Design a protein with these regions (language model features):
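Gram-negative bacterial Sec-dependent N-terminal signal peptides
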Residues: 10-14
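Bacterial N-terminal signal peptides that target proteins for export
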Residues: 1-7
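Short amphipathic alpha-helical "recognition" segments used for binding
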Residues: 7-9, 110
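Short glycine/serine-rich loop/turn segments
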Residues: 65, 98-190
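Short, well-ordered alpha-helical
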Residues: 21-124, 155-156
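C-terminal motif of bacterial Sec signal peptides marking the signal peptidase cleavage site
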Residues: 17-19
Length: 190
């Protein structure tokens, strides 16, 4: 084999290997820790908007279509908040502790931007003027409240998650079972 052919074959192999290594894998936040998510954000592997969109898409794909019914309401301002946090990241300013971490809160926590029913149809039009103390702390720390989860009416049942406002929540791993109790929506949402 001539030197030219050997050189050409070697060059093609090296270029092929290099192109395989340079392909960027799609980052997947499922089962990621807060630190892993924030590292991916800081390294530019994902934007805050992309992250929130992934979680909203997962809710749309898995919750109602699969009969889980863990989510009661989606925060219509979640992507807008994500855009603001993307701008904060670009600015180089210091980032809050829970920067861009998507959070789902139980429907008995007041949120100024979503209905709070406590699982009861009686409160179907209850839009609190302020956040609950802990929700405010989460937002101040940079978390994005993306949705609220179903709960047993008035947080009363230790056995199953059924509310007059949003119905029954099933176990995310097997819808023939219940996630149990007043926080079942949160359990299945996770």
């Amino acid at each position: 084999m001539s030197r030219f052919k050997l050189f050409s074959i070697t060059l093609v192999i090296l270029l092929t290997l290099n192109s395989c290594q340079s392909r960027q894998t799609i980052w997947n936040p499922v089962e990621s820790t807060i630190n892993e998510i924030q590292d991916a954000l800081i390294l530019g592997e994902i934007t805050c908007r992309n992250l929130v969109s992934i979680y909203l898409q997962r809710i749309e794909t898995y919750d109602k279509p699969n009969g889980i019914n863990a989510i009661t309401v989606i925060n219509s301002q979640a992507l807008e908040k994500a855009d603001k946090l993307d701008r904060l990241l670009e600015s180089g300013d210091s980032l809050p502790e829970l920067f861009c971490i998507p959070i789902i809160v139980k429907d008995n926590f007041d949120t100024h931007d979503m209905v709070t029913t406590g699982g009861s149809v009686v409160l179907r039009d209850s839009y609190p003027p302020d956040d609950a103390f802990m929700v405010g702390k989460l937002r101040d720390a940079g978390a994005i409240i993306i949705a609220k989860s179903n709960m047993a009416e008035w947080a009363f049942s230790p056995r199953e998650t059924v509310s007059s406002s949003f119905g029954r929540t099933a176990n995310a791993y097997d819808i023939n079972f219940v996630p149990a109790g007043s926080s079942g929506g949160t359990a299945s949402a996770v």
